[in-house]
């Protein structure tokens, strides 16, 4: 996936670029992370954690006093303080994710991408993570339920006009290079050779680039130059 870091930096895994089915989907994830930065979520999260330390310290003080007379009471007081602190942090995280989704949609639209890319990509994430969602208690999730987030996104884009956006050649070339870097060189050569032979590609230029890159990995330099 992708993540926001201190200083306004954003990290992107190559797996995300390969998993997206359009440039708008990739842009939607980046818009979400950019919104984390512009809305100062990390700084606000750290501030919330600092505020959460006071209840924890009070619970610890109560636990120490209670331990003199009743160890079970002491343990209960400490666990209550910990649970309250964790729940408060999770609430902040869920709110930040919702805000980043909403701000991200606006940013995506202003940048000229298809805003439906966000709902499409998160929809696939929901399918991949369904097993996790069915077994994890909702209140412990650090992100809102995927179904809730998708529903909110779809509600926000319904009133907006449809915009079909073609993928740029740069995006397709990057995807081709990453896919040509997967697995063994011979496997990559076979994969791209098959795509070109069967004409199973979005862009012939990107497919030929991936094939040449795979051939170079396999040390077939003369064939790659052709």
How would you name each of these model-derived features?
Residues 1-8:
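Catalytic zinc-binding patch centered on the HExxH motif and its immediate surroundings
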Residues 11, 25-33, 37, 75, ...:
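Short alpha-helical catalytic segment bearing the HExxH-like zincin motif
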Residues 11-28, 90-95:
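Short pre-active-site segment immediately N-terminal to the catalytic Zn-binding motif
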Residues 23, 27-30, 50-58:
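Post-signal-peptide, soluble extracytosolic/periplasmic N-terminal scaffold domains
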Residues 24, 34-51, 69:
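Catalytic Zn2+-binding segment of zinc metalloproteases
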Residues 46-54, 75-77, 112-122:
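Acidic/histidine metal-binding catalytic segments
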Residues 53-69, 76-84:
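Membrane-active amphipathic alpha-helices enriched in small hydrophobic residues
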Residues 84-226:
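Extracytoplasmic and endomembrane cell-envelope/extracellular-matrix remodeling and assembly machinery
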